[in-house]
Amino acid sequence: MAAAIISELQVKGKYGKYGGQYVPEVLMPALEELEEGYERYKNDPEFLAELDHYLRDFAGRETPLYLARNLSKKYGTKIYLKREDLVHGGAHKLNNAIGQALLAKYMGKTRLIAETGAGQHGTATAMAGANLGFETVVYMGAKDVKRQQMNAYRMELMGTEVKPVKTGSKTLKDAINEAFRDWVTNIGNTHYLIGSVVGPHPYPMIVRDFQSVIGREVKEQAMEKEGRLPDTIIACAGGGSNAMGTFYPFIEDRDVRLIAVEAGGKALRCTEKAALHSASLCAGEEGILHGARTKVLQDKNGQILESESVSAGLDYSGVGPELASLAESGRVTARYVTDDEAVEAFNELSRLEGIIPALESSHALAYLKKAAESGELGEFVVVNLSGRGDKDLETVLSLKRGI
């Protein structure tokens, strides 16, 4: 399961013109230490055997590739769901969290810090930290703590200290900023467990590699169930970890269409100080955010705009540099759906299949309707169901009540 991990970059830390290490000099030793540790252990048989054990017996892998018969009937094609919602904790986030936590253990670290938006990555970090015996601190935007109170409590229940961030937009972007500040102060004993394919090298590579278990499983399961690879694979994209994890094993399979669906929020436009969406691939510009050159939402002066989405996990002003490069090259197609369309898809899957999806995953599901109309689906489609939706029930209920 945890096959030997091979990571290739054209230039160290670069994906075409994106990526790199745009960080203060004080962080360079920590990034170099992390890269050296990862290169040392990523193909180590003992490390891989232990990672395989945790993925199988703790996380519950492999996850099913489920034929959604009622959804398939509605859209006139075979639609399979990759059930990452069934991973321990309710989302794909544990794939990366357990991988990085185990790496930190092998590197001799005793403390984990992380950022979180929807709370899924924070929860996954809390789970991994508790299981592997780490002191764990999670930074979470105060706005996100309010809309994801249950996840904040779950983290605290597992011994994690949750620190609300009350600066800026009080969301994921600001939580990442605070986590970096913590890391600078505590580099000696602390590993910063970034939750998406963002940040300075080597993070986008490491997170992608640990999440690629999704795509590797899809590849094997597709051959078992249909005898061939899918025509189309759809995944939501905020920072992009579930999308990259699903897409990466298929990059060289040019007949497989890869579609990343972003959060279109209220509308694909911006005010003077904020975007009304979180669609960096569709509407962003080249810039630097959290240590990497990528596509970001920014104003005419290059200042980062606050993003907006009904989904806390997609509410981010940038995107992973490798995903930005793949979208720019045309290998990945970037699309977006609005808040309303995502909520409609949330309700639709719940009614048709008895599966309540996360609002993040609902963005990928919502694009099925548009893709069917545009002829992008083909005869065999896989949608990555990146998480379950119990965390979002209060949000959807509030929208229904008009609160």
From Swiss-Prot:
Superkingdom classification of source: Archaea
Pathway assigned in UniProt: Amino-acid biosynthesis; L-tryptophan biosynthesis; L-tryptophan from chorismate: step 5/5
Keywords, alphabetical: Amino-acid biosynthesis, Aromatic amino acid biosynthesis, Lyase, Pyridoxal phosphate, Tryptophan biosynthesis
Cofactor(s) needed: pyridoxal 5'-phosphate
Enzyme Commission (EC) number: 4.2.1.20
Family under the similarity heading: Belongs to the TrpB family.
Quaternary structure (record): Tetramer of two alpha and two beta chains.
Name of the protein described by the UniProt record: Tryptophan synthase beta chain 1
Organism name: Methanosarcina mazei (strain ATCC BAA-159 / DSM 3647 / Goe1 / Go1 / JCM 11833 / OCM 88)
